[in-house]
């Protein structure tokens, strides 16, 4: 065993591992990236301005939906106002059934309103059933329209 310890085994290393390290060749990562971006800026011709910085964000589903709704709202605001009004007017006409002139509606009118609902939707029941769609306050209609507006934008545009 002592004979094994006394002998020192020499390893043959490749030349790139045994070459002396030159101080100028060792460059930090930050300096290398700065040089690369500077070279890129010179090639593009924008050496006078700083390179653009890109930021990447990770979002969960709720944040992504919020951002998407914000983008839709901004896009909607940038559209022509008359076009938006005409779209809202046609949507409102399609969604709201006609109001009856008499306070008591006949059963035929009620049946026609119920049959005009989409399949799978039932008429409102309970205390809300006695209220006609025309007796809603403008605030309630506006809230409902806002909620449906986003759904229409997402699924039908």
From Swiss-Prot:
Quote the InterPro entries the UniProt record gives: MRI
Q: Where is this motif: KBM?
A: 1-21
Q: What happens when the gene is disrupted?
A: No visible phenotype in normal conditions: mice are fertile, do not show any gross abnormalities and do not develop spontaneous cancers. Mice have normal numbers of B- and T-cells, but show defects in class switch recombination in primary B-cells. Mice lacking both Cyren and Nhej1/Xlf show embryonic lethality caused by severe defects in classical non-homologous end joining (NHEJ).
N-acetylmethionine modification sites are 1
Q: Give the subcellular location.
A: Cytoplasm; Nucleus; Chromosome
Q: Where are the annotated segments for Disordered? A: 80-148
Recorded GO cellular component terms are:
cytoplasm; DNA repair complex; nucleus; site of double-strand break
Q: Which UniProt keywords apply?
A: Acetylation, Chromosome, Cytoplasm, DNA damage, DNA repair, Nucleus
Q: Name one GO biological process term.
A: protein localization to site of double-strand break
Give residue numbers for sequence motif XLM. Answer: 147-157
> What's its job?
Cell-cycle-specific regulator of classical non-homologous end joining (NHEJ) of DNA double-strand break (DSB) repair, which can act both as an activator or inhibitor of NHEJ, depending on the cell cycle phase. Acts as a regulator of DNA repair pathway choice by specifically inhibiting classical NHEJ during the S and G2 phases, thereby promoting error-free repair by homologous recombination during cell cycle phases when sister chromatids are present.
Summarize the subunit comment: Interacts (via KBM motif) with XRCC5/Ku80 and XRCC6/Ku70 heterodimer. Interacts (via XLF motif) with TRIM28/KAP1, ATM, MRE11, NBN and RAD50. Interacts with splicing factor SF3B1. Interacts with ERCC6L2; this interaction is DNA independent.
Record PANTHER family: CELL CYCLE REGULATOR OF NON-HOMOLOGOUS END JOINING
What name does the UniProt record give this protein?
Cell cycle regulator of non-homologous end joining
Underlying gene: Cyren
